[in-house]
C-alpha cells in the first residue's frame, strides 16, 4: 500500500476527528498540528514494521449551512 486516506471532520465539541478509509484506524485531536502527529502515530501503530503506507492523505470535510 503506497497511500492511506483519512476523512477529517470538525468534532462537535471542538477539534478534529479522523478515520481511515478501508482500515480500522480512528483518532482525534484539538488542532491541525496535533492531528498530523496523532494520525502518523496511529498509522505506524496499526501496520507491522515495513508495511505502513508511504503517504498519508488527509481529506478535510466541512459542512456549511447558509440561509436560502
What are these regions (language model features)?
Residues 4, 8-20:
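Short aromatic-glycine-(Arg/Gly/Cys) micro-motifs in beta-strand/loop hairpins
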Residues 13, 23, 40:
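ATP/adenylate-binding site constellation spanning eukaryotic-like Ser/Thr protein kinases
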Residues 1-5, 33, 37-68:
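Short, charged, surface-exposed hinge/linker loops at domain edges
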Residues 23-34:
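A short, exposed loop/beta-hairpin motif centered on an aromatic-Gly-Thr core
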Residues 20-21, 51:
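Residue-level signal for pocket-adjacent positions within structured domains
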